[in-house]
Amino acid sequence: MSGAIFGPLEGPSSLDAPSIHPLVCPLCHVQYERPCLLDCFHDFCAGCLRGRATDGRLTCPLCQHQTVLKGPSGLPPVDRLLQFLVDSSGDGVEAVRCANCDLECSEQDVETTYFCNTCGQPLCARCRDETHRARMFARHDIVALGQRSRDVPQKCTLHAEPYLLFSTDKKLLLCIRCFRDMQKESRAHCVDLESAYVQGCERLEQAVLAVKALQTATREAIALLQAMVEEVRHSAAEEEDAIHALFGSMQDRLAERKALLLQAVQSQYEEKDKAFKEQLSHLATLLPTLQVHLVICSSFLSLANKAEFLDLGYELMERLQGIVTRPHHLRPIQSSKIASDHRAEFARCLEPLLLLGPRRVAAAASGANTLAGGLGPKALTGPHCPSPVGKMSGSPVQKPTLHRSISTKVLLAEGENTPFAEHCRHYEDSYRHLQAEMQSLKDQVQELHRDLTKHHSLIKAEIMGDVLHKSLQLDVQIASEHASLEGMRVVFQEIWEEAYQRVANEQEIYEAQLHDLLQLRQENAYLTTITKQITPYVRSIAKVKERLEPRFQAPVDEQSESLQNTHDDSRNNAASARNNPGSVPEKREKTSEPKGNSWAPNGLSEEPLLKNMDHHRSKQKNGGDVPTWREHPT
């Protein structure tokens, strides 16, 4: 079998068809018989998958996803969850044997067969009267087999004891003997069945909500893709109409180019239509999978008792989590706009007729390439008729270069009072201002990041808020400048049409300016993200610092301030001593003394300073005030 169960989508209504039954195999269309689970979360009967494996890999018939097989059987593992639902459904009732006489009861005899909830065994009508006639069985709960209680306590397969506890660590049901055999560390993870059931239901509900959210997003993505398919169709039709309208006025000279343009539009249409439909087909295979698993969750909750839920519930949760965490392409991979650059092509084709200069045609081609996203020359290149637009790829207006500043300086050095030169003068001033603010923010964020990670210093939350506020303000300024710059494109376009020889350089500078602003904005976004990431850590560290060391900064600041005052006073006293004219005679007398005593003035001037420093330290230790002036001995 090719595996193409879901055929090509014929329209939006095909996605609204009723989904398949969750207990019916998509290949054989009957109830599952030993269902096997693939890595893509699709289930198939073991018989339907037998013989499909190649080199240890099995390709899913629905989504073509390959599953690596483990083991010599050549089949994926049995889906215990789906097998439980099949066994628990009404269509999967097996033959029951009487526990006393081994009489097999068929499906027609289910109503005449009984089940003892106390003994946990099925009984036929004759054995019910014979074995449970005694008085000791008078309190046994005997009901019809179809009405037996699903809450009958299951027993441990190792110790034949009823399950009492559940290990949240190993996800296993435990009897009392299993609990005694466990290590003491593992016993802390054991809870009673009721608590484990409540916790499991809560976790399963969260998983179901995640799947429902993915289901809603998938439906929205499918609707969006369907709308984009229609937009592609309408866009192609509009583009063809425009091409036909322009071709009608110049039929003789544009016959060959018309066919080429239509071929380009058709090629783009087929490419985009194929891409959208492939993505749509992928999402269409995902949606039934989500629906099936939601139905499985609902059926499992209604059919499973507590023990069965705890036995299989976490497997279901892991499966739902796996479905949600798988990569799903919910967004369109390309735009729905089709552009053929027909105006530039027609202008080039009509150049001999309309006597257009090559530079003017080049300007029209570059403008059309800008509007069409640069798709024109590549889209119009055919296998047998190469487009002459390819020769225009050497146009100087391609992308911003790294020599914008040099080109701007050369342009301004010419001294001409053109509109673009005035714009460049204004732009350079504003850009320099924005760049300076950006550099300031960079330095500040780097310093804060270094203080936080390397020095582990205390950073106030107000500082981070101020940095974030400045970053947002800078982003607004950059956006405003970019919008203002973008709004002048029309004005400059008219000037470039009139004087194209100078426009080539000006356009290069202009595009580079836009690129610089976008780069600044991107850097600012990075800084904003880093600031937002650092802010919670700064606040938490500040709170811890305030709790642990509330008076950590005060003594250090007072001591540093007092030392600074001492140093400033000593310098002021030295300066006043030099400026005092009364010290001149004394200095002359000292200079007349022998040279052997020339060290004495320095010693006398340094000794009071040392004494004053010792006096300052002693007063600071004793809690005294620090003097702001000093007395020099005469």
From Swiss-Prot:
A zinc finger (RING-type) spans 25-64. Transmembrane segments: none annotated. Plays a role in cardiac repolarization possibly by stabilizing membrane expression of the potassium channel KCNH2/HERG, or by assisting its synthesis, folding or export from the endoplasmic reticulum, in a heat shock protein-dependent manner. It is found in: Cytoplasm. The keyword Coiled coil applies. Keywords: Coiled coil, Cytoplasm, Metal-binding, Zinc, Zinc-finger. This is RING finger protein 207. A zinc finger (B box-type) spans 93-145. GO terms for cellular component: perinuclear region of cytoplasm. It comes from Homo sapiens (Human).
